[in-house]
Design a protein with these regions (language model features):
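Alpha-helical adaptor scaffolds
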Residues: 191-225, 229
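Cyclic-nucleotide recognition modules
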Residues: 352-390
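Structural detector for internal amphipathic alpha-helices that build alpha-solenoid repeat scaffolds
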Residues: 1, 7-20, 29, 39-53, ...
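Eukaryotic acidic, Ser/Thr-rich intrinsically disordered low-complexity regions
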Residues: 247-285
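Short inter-helical turns and helix N-cap capping residues of alpha-solenoid HEAT/ARM repeat scaffolds
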Residues: 3-7, 34-37, 67-71, 134, ...
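Amphipathic alpha-helical scaffolding segments comprising HEAT/armadillo-like alpha-solenoid repeats
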Residues: 1-2, 20-34, 53-65, 84-101, ...
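Regulatory nucleotide-sensing modules
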Residues: 288-349, 356-360
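A small-molecule sensor/coupling module
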Residues: 281-293, 307-310, 372-373, 380, ...
């Protein structure tokens, strides 16, 4: 029942009534028997956080891998909970050094990948995805590093360190320098200390070993729909030579990619277009186009494109004629809108209280608090709005 979100907490409480060694053994068996059940694996990792046994640390470490960020985030969080609740000492820094090294190397590789990309519109989503993955890797690294001193100030500063806006960073850096070994600091500092950058020679070596084309090819063949779609979209717009190097048998058909390939010129390429034909209704904007539009809105600009694409898939663009009402004061607030084109007048009674144009959002408060609309919204001219349902 651990994988059933409705039963998870209750199941954990019941398991606490049994001998912890038996529980740990059975959970480990489940991990082995149901390797492909990702939801179960996540919940077992969360469940194991309630046991401070050395065996649990070993089990979780095995699932802390660079090729599965989602599981690794949960593993790092569970390990920190264990470290905070342990009374016995454990050599966390030495035991997890190789793990930290693997994650910092992956972070560095992504850093080099980003450097190799040109600064233009066709690389926007790839850079956005790299930034997203780098932030998540850094989160895992800082959580695992903190295991050595679990009640240190590092944990409470992780979010700000990742966002590069921690006012206390000088004190955090000083704390790290006095608390960790030189080999750990050598891995950590280039990621968080603005004055301690990666050496240019090291970057150039990495770029030689993993050139841009190999990254784009690997991402195109990824089983992650978003990464695959944005990489193939990049190839079509910027570098068609990569297209013929892609192993299309590895590329998974998905709605985003189907739209990317829908009107592409297949001449001189090896793209098996029939594999990616998706019988969906025609839309005014593709998922990628809607995601780009959402990224221009203040409300969504800090959300990674991969997550925003999920919002794009449940949104619809709609035309409104000049003078047409979008919603009235008192209507049920079951959706929000983004202005894509035109102008929208927000009125209360006979008074205009706001005039919204491209990029503005409206109706979001009613969506969040389930209250009725508190004003009227009327198209001031012919407009196109993106409607996002609850």
């Amino acid at each position: 029942n651990l994988e059933n979100i409705k039963c998870t907490l209750k199941t954990r409480k019941i398991l606490k009534l049994y001998n912890y060694k038996i529980v740990i053994r059975h959970l480990e068996e489940q991990l082995s028997l149901k390797k492909d059940n990702k939801n179960l694996k996540k919940e077992i990792m969360r469940c194991l956080a309630g046991y401070a046994d050395d065996r649990v640390i070993q089990i979780i470490k095995r699932h802390l891998k660079v090729n599965n960020i989602n599981i690794s985030i949960i593993c790092s969080e569970s390990l920190l909970k264990i470290a905070k609740n342990r009374s016995k000492t454990f050599s966390f820094e030495d035991y997890f050094f190789d793990t930290i090294k693997n994650f910092t190397h992956q972070y560095f590789k992504l850093h080099c990948f980003r450097i190799s990309l040109a600064d233009n519109k066709s690389t926007f989503f790839i850079k956005d995805q790299i930034d997203y993955e780098m932030r998540r890797y850094l989160y895992i690294i800082l959580k695992v590093v903190t295991l050595k001193i679990p009640n240190s100030p590092i944990d409470s500063h992780i979010k700000n360190i990742i966002e590069n806006n921690d006012k206390d960073l000088p004190y955090i850096l000083e704390f790290l320098e006095t608390s960790f070994s030189k080999k750990t600091l050598n891995l950590l500092m280039p990621m968080i200390d603005p004055e301690n950058n990666y050496k240019n020679e090291k970057i150039q070596n990495q770029l030689s070993n993993n050139p841009l084309n190999s990254w784009i090819k690997n991402w195109s063949e990824s089983d992650k729909n978003w990464k695959s779609a944005i990489s193939i979209d990049y190839c079509l717009k910027h570098d068609k030579e990569i297209i013929n190097n892609i192993d299309w048998s590895k590329v998974v058909s998905n709605p985003i990619l189907s739209q990317v390939l829908e009107n592409c010129d297949n001449k001189g390429t090896s793209i098996p277009l029939e594999k990616f034909q998706n019988k969906t209704e025609k839309t005014m904007f593709t998922i990628l186009e809607k995601t780009i539009l959402l990224k221009t809105v203040d409300l969504f600009q800090d959300i990674p494109g991969e997550l925003l694409s999920q919002v794009s898939q449940i949104s619809k663009a709609k035309n409104y004629d000049n003078g047409e009402t979008i919603f009235r004061d008192g209507d049920v607030g079951d959706s929000m809108f983004i202005v894509l084109e035109g102008k929208i007048s927000i009125t209360k009674g006979d008074k205009e209280i706001a005039l919204l144009d491209k990029g503005a959002s409206l109706g979001e408060m009613a969506l969040l608090d389930n209250e009725n609309r508190s004003a009227n919204a009327i198209a001031k001219e012919d407009s196109i709005l993106l409607k996002i349902n609850q």
